[in-house]
Amino acid sequence: MVTRLIRATMDGVQNSVRISGELSSSFESRRGLRQGDGLSCLLFNIALEGVMRRAGLNSRGTIFTKSSQFVCFADDMDIIARTFGTVAEQYTRLKREAAKVGLVVNAAKTKYMLVGGTERDRTSLGSNVTIDGDTFEVVEEFVYLGSLLTADNNVSREIRKRIISGSRAYYGLQKKLRSKKIHPRTKCTMYKTLIRPVVLYGHEMWTMLEEDMQALGVFERRVLRTIFGGVQENGVWRRRMNHELAALYGEPSIQKVAKAGRIRWAGHVARMPDNNPAKLVFANHPVGTRRRGAQRARWADQVERDLASVGRDRRWRAAAANRVLWRQIVDSVLS
């Protein structure tokens, strides 16, 4: 009954396009879903779930315990596998099952990235790979769901990318931030709601170096200097010093906000069920070796350092189970 009702709403759909205030003649849609229809997202997800099941693609678990993993958010898909052959097999099955329901993989927007591996592996791979007749560019970095993923897991490049995006938002609002008609507190609210979130998108998972923290601070002070302007002493204008900006702003710095967000997310992960993908990745210990010399900090190491700065690094996973206590810990980071 429900299927027939849905089909009835989709059959014989007439559309028109508004051009320069005038409507075009109507035309009938015989394929695809209607843009803006409340059912479109649901129907697409059902169709894609059916494709995944028939193709034998399993999104559960993690790559630590399987030869391949399929990650999907709407129509943004990621095939993760241990070998090129497994990637090719999974892609071929996905492509052929998707074609049966009228879905086509956009090969032009699909990229292939080798994570880890040696320089010899990268050289032998070349600049393109071909799978089932489709040619994909081999890349060193790729933007997935707004975040920059790199072959060497370089988070600093993602942070630089976020700062560049934040700079675009800043320049777009620069005229208002310089305006004498807008109160500085209102400008600060504009910064916190329209600019800072652009910079801190995905910050909960950042493992940051000291130079990354400094880059964030430099960006924030640039915005604050625009908001509060210079100061005149003895008829001479000078740029405000860092401590003067902090006193005028009166809010937690962007570095503290990033640290608090990371701790807040760590608490969420610690409280997740054991079969949750994020919890599985966090609790797992991948098989392999680490390079000689000084080791890169892991995300868990960063969280423990953040908690150590407020004296909460011991038994923090147990503390995370208490939401009220954990909220107090997060607030203490912002103070």
Residue ranges and their predicted role:
Residues T3-M10:
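Short, well-structured alpha-helical segments
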Residues T3, N15-S335:
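Short linear motifs embedded in intrinsically disordered, charge-biased segments
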